[in-house]
A protein has these predicted regions:
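C-terminal cap/substrate-recognition subdomain and adjoining C-terminal extension
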Residues: 2-6, 86-198
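Short, compositionally biased "basic patch" segments
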Residues: 48-53, 59-74, 132-137
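Metal-dependent phosphoesterase signature
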Residues: 60-94
């Protein structure tokens, strides 16, 4: 067995680093609560179909977020994400934050791997000193506008493992800790050397 001198720690964001899911919280912050609720009502049949696993969450999530943000200038969206970091900091879980800092002090390379959109996750997480944020990302057209489509696959389930391997390809070289709270973290748990559901 190869001795693993290096250590990597992977944290989910929504419900793991934060006390709750941030998608609708961010949408309300960016678009207002009224528009957020209109979208929820309009897309409730599609959300129900997704929960019954008739369509995958990637397609449902893309349709919903497209309704809110398609056509928005990327720079405006990015700035909203930067501003949201101040609010999101109040949602951090003290226990998970302490664990993240512990892993950093041990010399782990730390990644946040999230199905949420990079622009509202990265500003906060990078300020915590993580090495990188691996997440879902919006496509931006040549005019600098959001197309409403994702430029990468929704970073959920097995996609989380794929994204980690892009930045940490030599799996035999490191001991992997994984932390999450939902079924979207199952494949990462199975891929890790040690995991904890928080």
């Amino acid at each position: 067995m190869v001795k693993k001198n290096n250590k990597v720690a992977v944290f989910d964001f929504d419900g793991t680093l934060t006390s709750r899911d941030t998608m609708f919280d961010f949408v309300a912050f960016a678009c207002g609560k009224m528009r957020m609720w209109i979208g929820v009502i309009l897309f409730s049949p599609i959300i129900a179909i997704m929960l019954m696993k008739i369509i995958d969450n990637n397609r449902c999530k893309q349709m919903l977020l497209s309704w809110y943000f398609k056509g928005m200038e990327y720079e405006k969206f990015r700035q909203i994400g930067e501003n949201y970091a101040v609010r999101a900091r109040k949602l951090l879980r003290d226990d998970t934050l302490q664990l993240l800092r512990q892993r950093q002090e041990e010399g782990c390379r730390v990644y946040v791997v999230s199905a949420s959109i990079r622009e509202w996750v990265a500003p906060l997480c990078l300020s915590l000193g993580v090495n990188e944020v691996l997440s879902t990302e919006f496509e931006v057209d040549d005019s600098g506008l959001l197309t409403g489509r994702f430029s990468v696959h929704n970073c959920f389930g097995k996609e989380k493992v794929k994204r980690l391997l892009l930045v940490e390809p030599d799996r035999d070289d490191y001991y992997l800790y994984a932390y999450g709270d939902s079924r979207g973290d199952k494949e990462m748990f199975e891929f890790s050397d040690e995991y904890k559901k928080l």
